[in-house]
């Protein structure tokens, strides 16, 4: 557990008005986001069978919540960490065409999450995925899509200002692009998290690219599962968040692996045993479309747009009593 208490925190909205604002942001954003990227809303599962290989393994150390079901025999069922792989299969299953895509309201439990102002065991995000061609698996495609997403987020600042002018947190006008290697070259003596804070404070908003593989130092900037993002074609959208004087990650996204990049990354991750799983076989034999996709944090977006000090102000979850007490003493009202 780690908690940042901002100086003299004064929430601009009551708990009741905050709830109204959350609903407005969620409903407005998903409509504009879907229209901008040509995405249709789909219903999505809260749990999948472990044997399918569809769950997100995150960094490889987080354990999903699992259980059995009365009518499913000995099959292990897992609550999703995310829908990164499920979405790609869904695009095939439901017959989406080139440059069409889907988004879902994804709810997940990450029981091993380190809790702080930004991180909760309960994850709510818009998980999205879009069909592209093999030739479009490029940095240009990635950057163009990032700019589209940034455009919608920036427009949401104005939408929120119209409805809740006293609460809106102002966002930068431009997003900048930088790779993890460029960041390490520039700030070799800082930790990865410190580098993110330094560059985001300087530029306001950045898309940090190429996360997952080893840098020249031999270290990774951060971990990424080896079987959905191509580590050379992915990244995080980060905003400088002045209320907490830190960078806040709003989205993790990327162009998805093809057979070659998946095999290479699974070998690096010492996880080649996954190649026999149904999802991985579909990627190997090009039985699922080439795609780009990611997740956009719903609660984090609300937190960013409303200038909140803790994600627990915009979502109902469980927190240690010590964190609850410290927040109450600092005028931070957790739901």
From Swiss-Prot:
GO terms for molecular function: aspartate-ammonia ligase activity; ATP binding; catalytic activity, acting on a protein; transferase activity. CDD domains: AsnA. PROSITE patterns: AA_TRNA_LIGASE_II. The keyword Repressor does not apply. Its EC number is 6.3.1.1. HAMAP family: AsnA. This is Aspartate--ammonia ligase.
